[in-house]
Amino acid sequence: MNIQAPVKVDKAERMRRAREEAYATPLSQFHPGAPRLFQDDTLWPWFERLRKEEPVHYCTNAPIEPYWSVVKYNDIMHVDTNHGIFSSDSKLGGISIRDVPEGYDYPSFIAMDQPRHSAQRKTVSPMFTPQHLDELAKLIRQRSQTVLDNLPRNETFNFVERVSIELTTQMLATLFDFPWEERRKLTRWSDVSTALPKSGIVASAEERRREMDECYAYMSKLWNERVNSAPRNDLLSLMAHNEATRHMDPDNLMGNIILLIVGGNDTTRNTMTGSVLALNENPEQYDKLRANPELIDTMVPEVIRWQTPLAHMRRTALQDTEIGGKHIRKGDRVVMWYVSGNRDEEMFDKPNEFIIDRPRPRTHLSFGFGIHRCVGMRLAELQLKIVWEEMLQRFDRIEVVGEPKRIYSSFIKGYETLPVRIPG
């Protein structure tokens, strides 16, 4: 499949060309994991065709090892909940479509099988209890108010930088009890840890390695401080004072730290940005929300479905098995495309429409299912809910005034920039 460099054309024409190419390309040449499709936002017809014609598809036409694409909701659920057959172990390649690069095998509980997975995951769970979320809600609201009150009026600015990154970075600094003045390091490390070389985030694998080494050195210092001090209410301290994680080797420590940084950054940050874009692309839904702010409660999970901030998760087959009538061999990589399952026509009514009062909005796949379901999903929902409550109180409308710039990745489905303007 030949993906051309993006051309400056309007969205409707871009999608027309993408649909034409997707339906003209032989299925044997499909590579739905090509990052360019996600950066150009032209992935949709490719996955639409797979759902219709070959919902379990084997790709051999890619610059990476062959992989299975699982694109329908129920098939994805089957893979996601059968952890005895489908492994996320980093030693087998990890959780993304590309194998873990040599020297980057940092095992984390999301890239572990049982019983180690649950033992380590339970260590950080107290941070996300309903009681603790109630405590965090006050802080989230105060910070949202401060950030929003300082936004310019009648002036174009980057919503990603001024709002999404700033609010998620502040929360990460709180969760880790990280030095406040250096909090932007956390989102930088998150971006670098998932970036491809020449993606615009890092120029080379060597640059990525240098920055990850910096992350390791910095977080190791904080870790040693937590180990040698009384327990505190932050993620590092929870791990430092629990027997399941206290004696982690350095790679396991680094893996869990990166997991928690990325998890706390990408879902909220990119869905927050995506919500502004979705409401601008669907002005009748924006009007509906402004007329009835109580719809925030259903709008939040709907925009998480709509955005799908983590486009896929990968597993490795531990034995010969079958998905959708296709024979999967032991050792095969199996990619669950959440971004496609969330648009499955057999699961969702009008799946390509953004409907803020959609019935049963939490049936989306964006947080995964089974033992690896996102541990911080309620915190992500809470942050999105509060920021929209505060935005609706302050602004009649936030207007998108230019095309977003999307990340070059088929793993993190997010944004670098979203130019907006607040009238008034």
Task: Please provide the spans of the model-predicted regions.
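Cytochrome P450
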Residues: 1-424
